[in-house]
């Protein structure tokens, strides 16, 4: 959810930099103390945001040459963000335009593909993750506001409609875009107590009756419990990779592996060291963002 909002902040810097040039003396603000020119704005914008903007523009060109992102992938990601962000997404689209958000999502997807190509998942990583699943289950849910809607969903499930499809159609939870999947969780401390008790009573594959909590009415499906390591290894490898893809520092490190193979030469003397320091600065800023 944060990524598209961060992209919008980057948008402000890129649009401002592209709107003026260092040699432009056109006055854009007048005061009793003196005027401010486009050139002064450009110089100051370059000092504060030039390196990060240049990094994104160059990375996108390099990654776009090596990896391909389809229009369908972009549209699906935008739909996911729209579901997650709601009114915030509408505000971003109104402020920056759909085309710009598409471009930012394309950059994000290119980055993910580079990360998948360069991030390694070891057997030790998988074993550690498997050990951490002890006592946990995996479940999905459909959250609705009232009992009547819950009963309507329940009827459709009994008629054979897919749980995942109904979650996407009816659920008001952010997990809707993932078919209601909540991932793995323990019996205590992670979920609403009433919800957790109902989920842990289910057999794998079983669907609950509507369960009322402070959030509304849930229909819960237990999808998995921890099995033997060898039986789960392939599936868990994908889950561990997904976790690593959500680690911005790991993603930036993976992207830098691609960038190091590109023949990058920065002509601007003020920005010539951008790609000597961008790896460190990006990782640091990403880690800071995650900790907030």
Swiss-Prot record:
Residues 276-292 have a biased composition (Low complexity). Residues 1-19 form the signal peptide. One of its GO terms (cellular component) is membrane raft. The keyword Flavoprotein does not apply. A lipid is attached at residue 20 (N-palmitoyl cysteine). It holds the Pfam family Rotamase_3. Changing residue 171 to A: No effect on secretion of proteins and on growth. Keywords: Cell membrane, Isomerase, Lipoprotein, Membrane, Palmitate, Rotamase, Signal. Its EC number is 5.2.1.8. Changing residue 216 to A: Decreased secretion of proteins; no effect on growth. It is a lipid-anchor. A lipid is attached at residue 20 (S-diacylglycerol cysteine). One of its GO terms (molecular function) is peptidyl-prolyl cis-trans isomerase activity. Gene3D superfamilies: 3.10.50.40, Trigger factor, C-terminal domain. Residues 270-292 are annotated as: Disordered. Changing residue 215 to A: No effect on secretion of proteins and on growth. Changing residue 141 to A: Loss of PPIase function. No effect on secretion of proteins and on growth. Residues 134-224 form the PpiC domain. It is found in: Cell membrane; Membrane raft. InterPro entries: Foldase_PrsA, PPIase_dom_sf, PPIase_PpiC, PPIase_PpiC_CS, PrsA_foldase, Trigger_fac_C_sf, Trigger_fact/SurA_dom_sf. It catalyses: [protein]-peptidylproline (omega=180) = [protein]-peptidylproline (omega=0). Belongs to the PrsA family. Essential protein that plays a major role in protein secretion by helping the post-translocational extracellular folding of several secreted proteins. Has PPIase activity but it is not essential for its function in vivo. All three domains (PPIase domain and the flanking N- and C-terminal domains) are essential for activity. This is Foldase protein PrsA. It comes from Bacillus subtilis (strain 168).
